[in-house]
């Protein structure tokens, strides 16, 4: 959720959530968004219901540690500068006018912690795992061992590629943490991954982390003793109609994604530059607006695909952005660039 309360409330409405349902929040509802304090309060209220379970994520753990461990006080300044462009620490920092330079870092830590006393008390007591029937819920993953409760806290909250590593349990393990798009080598896709063979479900749609993201809900229903999975999501991008046909011969897909954003520009063009990504050994054309330089190195701003989209007049597309003559769109679940002409935003 990452402080995106509007998106979370819209998702609950979309899935027709009621207090009779079981609701499980897999952590990381704080930081990165503009509504963090409001989100904490909303989640606090939800957690008072018997069928709501809220788990701790690495962001809740980090927030608690940063504000309650004196030895970490000096890290707050770096956190504000490099890690979080928004979130509750930054919000309270400005509310209390702590940017005037008159306080020590310990003093700043204490004042923010005092201001967020009730919120910190709530997140510091959140459980890390939840076993419910044949399901195990955890923020990031578990170690490959039967006694999963003895997994290290860093594994439970920060394991990066749990889907690739797998587990030894008979239970279905449901995780968030790593955006599902990171598991697709050549495609930007934020849909939930359901793998019955591996007994793993990954639900993180990248909200608060990726510019192309969605907030996912995994829906689990039991009918006549058989488990059924479905998914819904909220992705607040504007819809547009395509005004005229665009036919593009299908090209091979390449993708830039975390953590390999550094590229070498082979040939700079007027709109696109031919680039090489060393770690993935891929050559691809990147729209110039997505490239930037830092310390004499060239990087791609975010996840990027060089796939080009064909579309028919009247097709409905979601528009991520307009870059010169090209629209960066989602069409029939596929992300890519297209030379399409689009209408004004439309209701859908």
Regions found by a protein language model. Name each.
Residues 2-6, 31-34, 60-64, 176-185, ...:
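Active-site environment of divalent metal-dependent phosphoester hydrolases
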């Amino acid at each position: 959720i990452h402080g995106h309360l509007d998106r979370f409330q819209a998702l609950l409405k979309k899935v027709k959530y009621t207090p009779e349902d079981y609701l499980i929040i897999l952590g990381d509802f704080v930081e990165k968004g503009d509504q963090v304090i409001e989100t904490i309060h909303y989640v606090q209220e939800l957690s008072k219901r018997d069928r709501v379970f809220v788990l701790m994520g690495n962001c809740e753990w980090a927030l608690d540690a940063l504000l309650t461990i004196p030895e970490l006080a000096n890290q707050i300044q770096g956190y504000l500068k490099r890690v979080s462009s928004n979130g509750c620490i930054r919000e309270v920092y400005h509310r209390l006018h702590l940017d005037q330079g008159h306080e020590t870092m310990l003093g700043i830590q204490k004042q923010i912690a005092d201001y967020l006393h009730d919120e910190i008390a709530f997140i510091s007591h959140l459980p890390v795992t939840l076993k419910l029937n044949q399901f195990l819920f955890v923020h990031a993953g578990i170690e490959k061992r039967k006694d999963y409760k003895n997994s290290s806290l860093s594994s439970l909250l920060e394991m990066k590629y749990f889907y690739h590593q797998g587990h030894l349990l008979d239970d279905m393990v449901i995780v968030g943490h790593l955006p599902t798009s990171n598991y697709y080598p050549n495609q930007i896709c934020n849909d939930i991954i359901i793998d019955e063979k591996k007994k793993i479900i990954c639900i993180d749609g990248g909200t608060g982390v990726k510019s192309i993201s969605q907030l996912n809900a995994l829906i689990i229903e039991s009918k006549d003793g058989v488990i059924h999975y479905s998914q819904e999501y909220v992705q607040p991008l504007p819809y547009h109609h395509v005004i005229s046909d665009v036919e593009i011969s299908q090209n091979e897909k390449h993708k830039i994604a975390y953590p390999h954003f550094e590229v070498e520009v082979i040939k700079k063009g007027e709109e696109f530059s031919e680039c090489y990504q060393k770690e993935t050994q891929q050559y691809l054309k990147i729209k110039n607006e997505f490239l930037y330089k830092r310390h004499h190195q060239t990087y791609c701003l975010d996840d990027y695909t060089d796939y080009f989209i064909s579309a028919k007049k009247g097709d409905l597309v979601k528009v991520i952005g307009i870059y010169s003559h090209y629209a960066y769109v989602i069409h029939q679940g596929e992300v890519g660039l297209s030379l399409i002409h689009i209408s004004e935003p439309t209701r859908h």
